[in-house]
């Protein structure tokens, strides 16, 4: 679909939604294009988006689409309702500094291994929201050359972990054809080859869809690296992987992290771990809390100015709440709901930005060819596939699809601009910050949190020896070598799951049922 046509559809959809008053029923958000932002790619007739260039730190005129009325999800829910809708097409002459000035806290939650089309593609295909999602015409060839199309998944569990390492990801990309997902999955021994072409629906991920309806959905947030977890998480924390393409420690390189820069500037910060403290593999040993501490700090209004929160990572027989196959998406929804509601109920809500994103695509199909960016290492100029990303808060645009190009370095770019930090790398200055997600109209009038649907989960089986070689096995081994042994990992995982479910129930967004 050409960009001009997509813009026309978005405008028409927004008008229709306004006439029908759907937003008042809490049934989602529409999208109307604003031409003002950086990183807009062009689209072709088959629904694939073309290359897009990255710019410097984004200004307040960053591009967005949407403009429908934000609403609550209704039913069994918690939180305030009735927030004012954003005018996603409204121009602004405010720059990034002015937009970020009222922000006092930034919380970053990074989940695992899902692509944008896999998570949110059905917003376009099944619900008609005018975002860069699925059209239903997307296909990949199988090993015999037969077309395998996109289709709705029927279960919240994908048992077999699709390949997503450096080589596999580049084969899936195939110089922008994005046609290697099924063949790579098959070559890896997948029992159901078409699973990587499957997409989730609102019924399977109601929390994520409610947040996407009512806050800033970033439809062009790319993984920083076309490769696996560690390099992408390094870019979130360090704005570089030091040239690392694999899941291996880089502590010997002595690279500074965003936490170091914040410490230097006197900005309070903390890393909240669930079971596997990722920061250990690049040498950070201080300023580490547990997920239970996050809930306590949010409730008390004592969160640091900047924090990164990790879920229970699936590894070493632990089935986490991180969305990494074979983890159950329902547990991930409970985790996201609990983190969101902890902030929604916190006295810090009005001046906090919550960023929810995923480390990389996890081998799941996405139709948009990733663009390039600026990097000191030529092989790392190529971005990875799109990942789900939502920016949330009282000052954030409501129901808007943000078309500015982001990647994980956008977090460091935002913190660097907000607190006048020394940039970690040159890439920080060449990457858009998140100011285009903020609504100038809400700077002096932060909006109340939107209610979430109740997430009902069965009490999980946290450990499964049959899954010992699944998930973050390299991280589990690295943490064991650094003194966080297998027993400690399992104790931490059990405590973290318990904390999330306990707080989720206390906050009114999770209900746990026991098996008969």
Q: What is each stretch, according to the model?
A:
Residues 82-516:
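N-terminal pro-sequences and low-complexity stem/linker regions of secreted or lumenal proteins
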Residues 27-88, 93:
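Ser/Thr-rich, Pro/Gly/Ala-heavy low-complexity intrinsically disordered linkers and tails
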Residues 1-14, 21-27:
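N-terminal secretory signal peptides
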Residues 18, 26-36, 170-171, 180:
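A broadly tuned "polar low-complexity/structure-edge" signature
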Residues 8-12, 24, 55, 73, ...:
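Short amphipathic alpha-helical "recognition" segments used for binding
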């Amino acid at each position: 679909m050409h960009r001009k046509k997509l813009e026309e559809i978005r405008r028409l959809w927004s008008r229709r939604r306004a006439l029908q008053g759907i937003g008042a029923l809490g049934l989602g958000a529409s999208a109307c294009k604003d031409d003002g932002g950086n990183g807009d790619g062009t689209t072709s007739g088959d629904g694939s988006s073309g290359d897009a260039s990255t710019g410097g730190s984004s200004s307040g005129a960053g591009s967005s689409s949407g403009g429908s009325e934000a609403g609550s999800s209704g039913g069994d829910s918690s939180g305030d309702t009735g927030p004012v809708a954003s005018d996603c097409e409204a121009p602004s002459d405010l720059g990034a500094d002015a937009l970020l000035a009222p922000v006092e806290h930034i919380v970053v939650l990074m989940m695992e291994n899902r692509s944008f089309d896999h998570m949110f593609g059905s917003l376009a295909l099944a619900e008609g929201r005018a975002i860069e999602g699925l059209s239903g015409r997307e296909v990949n060839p199988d090993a015999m050359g037969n077309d395998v199309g996109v289709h709705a998944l029927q279960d919240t569990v994908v048992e077999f972990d699709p390949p997503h390492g450096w080589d596999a990801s580049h084969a899936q990309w195939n110089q922008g054809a994005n046609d290697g997902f099924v063949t790579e999955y098959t070559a890896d021994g997948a029992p159901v080859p078409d699973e990587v072409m499957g997409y989730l629906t609102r019924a399977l991920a109601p929390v994520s869809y409610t947040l996407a309806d009512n806050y800033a959905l970033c439809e062009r947030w790319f993984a920083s690296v076309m490769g696996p977890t560690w390099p992408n998480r390094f870019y979130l924390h360090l704005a570089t992987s030091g040239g690392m393409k694999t899941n291996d420690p880089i502590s010997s390189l002595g690279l500074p992290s965003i936490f170091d820069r914040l410490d230097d500037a006197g900005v309070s910060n903390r890393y909240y771990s669930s079971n596997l403290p990722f920061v250990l593999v690049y040498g950070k040993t201080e300023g580490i809390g547990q997920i239970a501490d996050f809930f306590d700090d949010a409730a008390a209004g004592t969160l640091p100015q900047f924090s990164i929160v990790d879920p229970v990572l699936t590894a070493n027989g632990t089935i986490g709440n991180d969305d990494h196959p074979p983890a159950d998406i329902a547990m991930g929804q409970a985790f996201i709901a609990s983190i969101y509601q902890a902030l929604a109920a916190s006295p810090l809500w009005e001046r906090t930005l919550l960023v929810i994103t995923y480390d990389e695509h996890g081998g799941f199909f996405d139709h948009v060819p990733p663009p390039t960016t600026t990097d000191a290492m030529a092989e790392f100029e190529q971005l990875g596939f799109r990942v789900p990303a939502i920016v949330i808060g009282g000052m954030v645009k409501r129901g808007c699809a943000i078309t500015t190009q982001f990647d994980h370095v956008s977090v460091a770019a935002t913190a660097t601009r907000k607190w006048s930090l020394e940039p970690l790398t040159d890439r920080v200055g060449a990457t858009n910050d998140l100011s285009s997600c903020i609504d100038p109209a809400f700077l002096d009038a932060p909006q109340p949190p939107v209610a979430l649907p109740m997430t009902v989960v069965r009490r999980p089986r946290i450990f499964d020896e049959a899954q010992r070689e699944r998930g973050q096995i390299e991280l589990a081994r690295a943490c064991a070598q650094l003194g966080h042994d297998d027993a400690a990992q399992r104790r931490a995982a059990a405590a973290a799951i318990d904390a999330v479910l306990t707080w989720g129930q206390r906050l009114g967004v999770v209900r746990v049922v026991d098996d008969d």
